[in-house]
Design a protein with these regions (language model features):
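Short, solvent-exposed loop/turn segments at secondary-structure junctions
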Residues: 54-56, 105-106, 143-145
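Catalytic cores of NTP-dependent nucleotidyl/adenyl transfer enzymes across multiple folds
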Residues: 13, 32, 123-194
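Short gly/ser-rich loop at a beta-strand->alpha-helix junction or flexible surface loop bordering the NTP-binding
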Residues: 46-54
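Catalytic metal-binding acidic patch
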Residues: 52, 59-80
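Helical scaffold of the NTase/Pol beta-like nucleotidyltransferase catalytic core
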Residues: 1-47
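Short amphipathic alpha-helical segments
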Residues: 26, 30, 76-83
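Conserved catalytic core of two-metal-ion nucleotidyltransferases
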Residues: 30, 88-134, 170-171
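Long, highly charged amphipathic alpha-helices
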Residues: 33, 82-89
Length: 194
């Protein structure tokens, strides 16, 4: 079982001493568990790790991110479901209660799975509400840009594993496209960071 006290020790005093960061710290730890698992699967050949969580875990941006986003050129919906089912089985074998709760969204062009962790926050003492929602979204979509991924080592919380990512130039162009398409503040922040 995950121990929040152990995870906190990987962070500077300013963060680990502030319980307001605990849910973010936990989410980031679970994201790293998932990425570490995926790095050892055959699907790794068809994906590149992108988005805000890439900036956090690979580049060191000083903001937490919610989702795991992948650029997957030749990954079918069935392969995506199989891949995320593997993630769920891995998390269950790691001692976590996990459920996939998928919502139909006709506007969504990406493949998405919402991986819920029922009662995890309550069990860890991070919430007084058993039913408080805690989830990680895994999304995959082909970005329409042909590029050779770069293998980088992702490290943190005691994890160390290789993962394909876009080059800095490609990642920057993806962030510019996101900024122009949706105009969210985090996209401007991310672009200034790059």
């Amino acid at each position: 079982m995950i121990q929040i006290e152990q995870i906190r020790n990987y962070f500077p005093v300013q963060i680990r001493g502030n319980s307001g960061f605990d849910k973010h710290i936990l989410k980031e730890y679970l994201q790293l568990m998932i990425l570490d698992y995926l790095s050892s699967t055959p699907n790794i050949q068809k994906m590149a790790f992108i988005g805000g969580t890439n900036l956090r875990l690979v580049k060191g941006i000083d903001r937490f991110s919610e989702d795991l986003d992948f650029d997957c050129k030749n990954l079918s919906k069935d392969e995506f479901i199989e891949m995320t089912n593997g993630v769920i089985q891995f998390l269950e074998r790691s001692g976590l209660r996990v459920e996939a709760k998928d919502k139909k969204n006709p506007k969504l062009t990406a493949f998405r799975r919402n991986i819920h962790f029922p009662e995890l926050l309550f069990d860890l003492g991070l919430s007084g509400h058993k039913e408080e929602r805690f989830l990680i979204k895994v999304e995959s979509q082909y970005q329409g840009i042909a590029y050779p991924p770069v293998i980088t080592n992702i490290k943190g919380y005691g994890f160390f594993f290789p993962f394909p990512v876009p080059s800095d130039g490609v990642l920057c162009s993806m962030k510019i496209a996101a900024m122009l398409a949706r105009a969210k503040g985090r996209d401007f922040y991310d672009l200034m960071f790059l």
